Amino acid sequence: LIAQDNQATILKKELEAKTIAKDPKDTANKTWKKGGFFSLNLSQSSLSNWAAGGEDYAFSVNTAFSGFAFYKKGKHQWDNTININLGYINNTSLGARKNDDRFDIVSKYGHEINAKLNFSTLFNIRSQFFDGYNFPTATTQVLNSSFMAPGYILLGSGLDYKPVKNLSIFFSPLTARWVIVNNDSLSKVGAYGVTPGSKSLFQLGAFASINYKANINKNVSYIGKLDLYSDYLMNPQNVAINMNNLFAVKISNVLSVTYSLDLIYDDNIRLFGPTKDAPRMQTKSIIGAGLLVKL
């Protein structure tokens, strides 16, 4: 019996000395959640002595990156997202041009009011990386945009409603918005609504942003965003619209088919119509097959 007692005491001390290692996959106490995806779509064709006709050579590449970092601790929430799209096309008749170019960064801090409602402050910056051109003819190009020309900076506070998982509806009745035209030739002609010679336009108005993502089934997913802005200072009835949609159909672990549809309307973007001085609804759609990697 004495021997058994001694053995039990030894085992007890050994157990007390051991520490239980935490499973690295255990995220119960993590305050940060991070992720995203990267996609790459390529296409190429070439013809030689082809009786049916067509471009002798055509090549295109489109890339997209979407990342997020969400923080939550107690009643505090901090949501950060970044979206980058770049596209390039080259063919025999038109030469090299870009067909996609944008970055969009959003940072939103919220304080929880209840399980579905936060009081939040949102910051957003949106623009492009490279020069953009109109092509009146196949050999003539006219600069119409550049890095931060236009650029949009937005700051506002309001309510962030999250009725269900993966749906966020943010509304701010008073939001400051700056339109930046950081290019001398574009600011000189008053592009994008700025006073000729000025490089910025200040706006004050109401802002709403709806963000939604869903797995339609195990192979089909959707990410959507709709931003609406009404400027109290000038023509509040002409609401600026910026909408992004992305559908992805999974083929394998790394291959997929993607379809994106973007819609933009801004009364200050007056580059269209017969005399190139009127606003229009802008649309961009891209479909492709290629690499899709979740991060």
Where in this protein do the model-derived segments appear?
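Sec-dependent signal peptide cleavage junction
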Residues: 2-37
